Structures are given as structure tokens and as C-alpha cells.
């Protein structure tokens, strides 16, 4: 297949992306604290990358409780919304499109980041056994062990759904084109999906129908708030991410969730594949089962090359590819790939925290 398909437009819910090379959500931890407020530097960073068919923002808190990393932005205060408005305006001025990725980090958090220094919340009081990021006195990211969470009470769960709903309303106000619900990588929605992190015995635990209940309630709240054509979702239903696996029936459970999402006609399904984290790549047989259940746009992300993306788009198994670190180092990634130009080297030491260095200073062609 010619690579022209990668550079052809794609209807994604309410928008039409100019190409199929999307910018994956990338946590960079450069927001202002206190307040978790996006900065003018972040506006410049995203504006530089507006040639992506769709920019998916870094993961963004739906509430103060949802915070898990020092320096990650929120979208639950007037100051945050006002700052995001400037960011989306800059992307739109360059004819780009932008979704905001909404998350609640759940147990991947630290008590020092939580309101009142409380324990983070989770489906069950089970440690994530992983690390998160705080800031040192110089504002640099430092890695620390996550705190032991407490289990959400049943009566608290509608409040989580409502926090997502309000964040979706705020995203609309802030000028985003779409939202992406973060239901992957071991964060709260994924914690409910996973039988290893969800030991509940009420209607949110046990069967796959119960474990998927929260994420589907959040999706339905988003559809009610803004319409199915504005709601995307990211899932990582195969493999293990941050010590959160998908249980012994991961494929069947994945297909149940994807079928339910497909029935709702949402804007897109973003599949975070396990091979970027050392897992096995998806088989075409599994991809075909996903496609049979979800007829809207499917975005692939993971250990992708241009060749892999072209092949899978050609087979009709995905519709777009989301690159991550390549976008960090190459603000003009689409032009570079189209011209087969050399890519800038990545500077991993500046991925998280800091200022303009390693953020807005990568050269273009």
C-alpha cells in the first residue's frame, strides 16, 4: 500500500483530521503549582505540533482528588479552563485539532498530592506497587513510591462519574474538539476493569459486566453531556501496565468492553498496545475481533513504525496511528515522515518537568 493513506483525511467523530498521524497523550509535568494550571510554554509546545491530525493532550485531572503526579494539569478550576482556552486557540489558529485526555489516577498517587493529605482512592485498598512523581525544591521531577489507597465507598462512585461529566463540560468550554477518557495504564478506570486491582463484592466488582460498569457510566455521562461524536476512549486491555494486568480472561473481557463501546457510537477507540512496554504485539486475529465490534475510528499506539501503521491501515484494522516520543522531539513530525527526513534525537532527561529545554526547543526542518 502506498503511504498516501497516512496523509489522507479521516473523520473522527465531530471533526475531520487532516491526516492519520496523531499525537499521543504525553505527560510532561510542567504545569504551575499550586493550582495545576497550564502555562504559556505549554501553549507554545502544543501550537508547534498542530500539524498532527489530532493532538491528544497530556493526561489532565478531572478533580483535585484525581491528581497523581506533581506538575500534571487539571481542568476543574476556572483558572485551569482559562489557561486551556489559550492552548486550544493556538492549535486552532494553526488549523489543528485537539482532544483533552481526562484521567483520575486512582491508586497511582501520593498522599502529599491529595486534598488534605488523604490516602488516594481506588476500587480496593490494594497498593499499586509502583512509583509516581513529586517535585523537589528546584521544581524537578523526583520518583517516589505510591501511597496505599483506600477503597471508594459505594456512595462515592456517582461523584466520580459526575467529576468526569463536569470535566467534559469544562473541556467544551475550554475549546477542545474532543475528549479522550483515560481507561488505560493502571489508572482509576482501568483499576476498576482489572480483577487484580478490583476485589469489590458490590455491583462494581466481580463479573466483567460489573468491573466495566464504571467506565461505561462515565462514557454514558459524557455522551449525555456533549454527544457521542465528542467522546473518545483509550484502553490497554491486553497485557500489564504499572502492575495492573487484565486478568486471566483478558481477551474476552476486552471484547466485551469494546462491544459495549461500539454500541454507543463514540468518536474513536484508542488502543494502547503492550509491545511498547515489553509485551507481546497484538495479532491480526485479535484486531479483526476488535474491528468486528467497533466500527468507528480505531487509533493504534505502541511500538509503531510508519511501515506497521501503513500495513494495518491498509488491512483496515486501524484507521490512524498515535506516535508519542517522536512528537516530543519532532514538532514537524508529519512533514518529516512525509519527506522521509531524519528525526531529531530524543532527550529523555527532559521528558518530565523542567522548562523550555527539551520541550519547545527541538528544531524543525
UniProtKB/Swiss-Prot annotation:
Which gene is annotated as encoding this protein in its UniProt record?
Answer: nemA
Cofactor(s) needed: FMN
**Keywords for the protein's UniProt record, in alphabetical order:** Flavoprotein, FMN, NADP, Oxidoreductase
What protein name is recorded for this chain? N-ethylmaleimide reductase
Residues reported to bind FMN: 101, 234, 324-325
Reaction it catalyzes: N-ethylmaleimide + NADPH + H(+) = N-ethylsuccinimide + NADP(+)
What GO molecular function annotations does the UniProt record carry, in alphabetical order?
Answer: FMN binding; N-ethylmaleimide reductase activity; oxidoreductase activity, acting on other nitrogenous compounds as donors, with NAD or NADP as acceptor
Q: What is the lineage of its organism?
A: Bacteria, Pseudomonadati, Pseudomonadota, Gammaproteobacteria, Enterobacterales
Q: What induces it?
A: Repressed by NemR. Induced by N-ethylmaleimide and reactive electrophilic species (RES) such as quinones, glyoxals and methylglyoxal. Up-regulated by HOCl.
Q: Which organism is it from?
A: Escherichia coli (strain K12)
Q: Where is the active site?
A: 187 (proton donor)
Q: Name one GO cellular component term.
A: cytosol
Write down the top EC class of this protein.
oxidoreductase
Amino acid at each position: 500500500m502506498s503511504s498516501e493513506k497516512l496523509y489522507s483525511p479521516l473523520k473522527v467523530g465531530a471533526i475531520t483530521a487532516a491526516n492519520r498521524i496523531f499525537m499521543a497523550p504525553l505527560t510532561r509535568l510542567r504545569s504551575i503549582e499550586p493550582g495545576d494550571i497550564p502555562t504559556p510554554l505549554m501553549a507554545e509546545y502544543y501550537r508547534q505540533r498542530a500539524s498532527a491530525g489530532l493532538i491528544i493532550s497530556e493526561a489532565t485531572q478531572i478533580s483535585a482528588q484525581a491528581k497523581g503526579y506533581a506538575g500534571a494539569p487539571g481542568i476543574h478550576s476556572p483558572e485551569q479552563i482559562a489557561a486551556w482556552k489559550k492552548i486550544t486557540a493556538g492549535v486552532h489558529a494553526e488549523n489543528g485539532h485537539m482532544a483533552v485526555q481526562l484521567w483520575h489516577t486512582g491508586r497511582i498517587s501520593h498522599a502529599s498530592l491529595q486534598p488534605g493529605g488523604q490516602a488516594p482512592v481506588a476500587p480496593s485498598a490494594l497498593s499499586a506497587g509502583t512509583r509516581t512523581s513529586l517535585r523537589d525544591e528546584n521544581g524537578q521531577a523526583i520518583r517516589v513510591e505510591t501511597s496505599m489507597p483506600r477503597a471508594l465507598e459505594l456512595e462515592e462512585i456517582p461523584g466520580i462519574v459526575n467529576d468526569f461529566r463536569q470535566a467534559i463540560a469544562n473541556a467544551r468550554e475550554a475549546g477542545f474538539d474532543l475528549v479522550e477518557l483515560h481507561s488505560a495504564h493502571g489508572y482509576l478506570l482501568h483499576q476498576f476493569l482489572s480483577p487484580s486491582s478490583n476485589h469489590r463484592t458490590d455491583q462494581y466488582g466481580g463479573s466483567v459486566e460489573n468491573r466495566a460498569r464504571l467506565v461505561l457510566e462515565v462514557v454514558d455521562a459524557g455522551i449525555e453531556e456533549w454527544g457521542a461524536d465528542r467522546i473518545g476512549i483509550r484502553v490497554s486491555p491486553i497485557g500489564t501496565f504499572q502492575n495492573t494486568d487484565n486478568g486471566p480472561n483478558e481477551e474476552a473481557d476486552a471484547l466485551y468492553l469494546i462491544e459495549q463501546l461500539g454500541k454507543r457510537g463514540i468518536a474513536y477507540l484508542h488502543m494502547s498496545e503492550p509491545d511498547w512496554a515489553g509485551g507481546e504485539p497484538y495479532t491480526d486475529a485479535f484486531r479483526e475481533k476488535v474491528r468486528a465490534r467497533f466500527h468507528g475510528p480505531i487509533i493504534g499506539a505502541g511500538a509503531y513504525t510508519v511501515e506497521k501503521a501503513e500495513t494495518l491501515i491498509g488491512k483496515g484494522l486501524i484507521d490512524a496511528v498515535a506516535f508519542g516520543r517522536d512528537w516530543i522531539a519532532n514538532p514537524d513530525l508529519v512533514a518529516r515522515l512525509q519527506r522521509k527526513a531524519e528525526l531529531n534525537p530524543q532527550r529523555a532527561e527532559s521528558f518530565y518537568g523542567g522548562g523550555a529545554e527539551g520541550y519547545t526547543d527541538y528544531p524543525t526542518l
